[in-house]
Amino acid sequence: MQVLVRDNNVDQALRILKKKLQREGVFREMRLREAFEKPSIKKAREKAEAIGRQRKLARKQMQREGLLPTKPRKDK
């Protein structure tokens, strides 16, 4: 992965690199590969993640249809 450093602004280039890595899922992949995960544990984790995604989608759809109240935004 490449990031262009403009005007010797390394901080900005580092922020852009981190954002790209985050979007690609590199940090998550590194965390998952730190230690061996048994196949049964991996399957259970993936199933739980899928259920969470489905619940989130259902909750968002219910909010769009007006069946659930939307979360109030916190004003600063």
Swiss-Prot record:
Pfam families xrefs: Ribosomal_S21 (PF01165)
InterPro entries assigned to the protein according to its UniProt record, in alphabetical order: Ribosomal_bS21 (IPR001911), Ribosomal_bS21_sf (IPR038380)
Keyword flag Cytoplasm: no
GO BP term (any one): translation
Disordered as annotated region, ranges: 52-76
Keyword annotations: Ribonucleoprotein, Ribosomal protein
GO molecular function: structural constituent of ribosome
GO cellular component: ribonucleoprotein complex; ribosome
UniProt similarity note: Belongs to the bacterial ribosomal protein bS21 family.
Protein name: Small ribosomal subunit protein bS21C
Highest classification ranks of the organism: Bacteria, Pseudomonadati, Pseudomonadota, Alphaproteobacteria, Hyphomicrobiales
Encoding gene per record: rpsU3
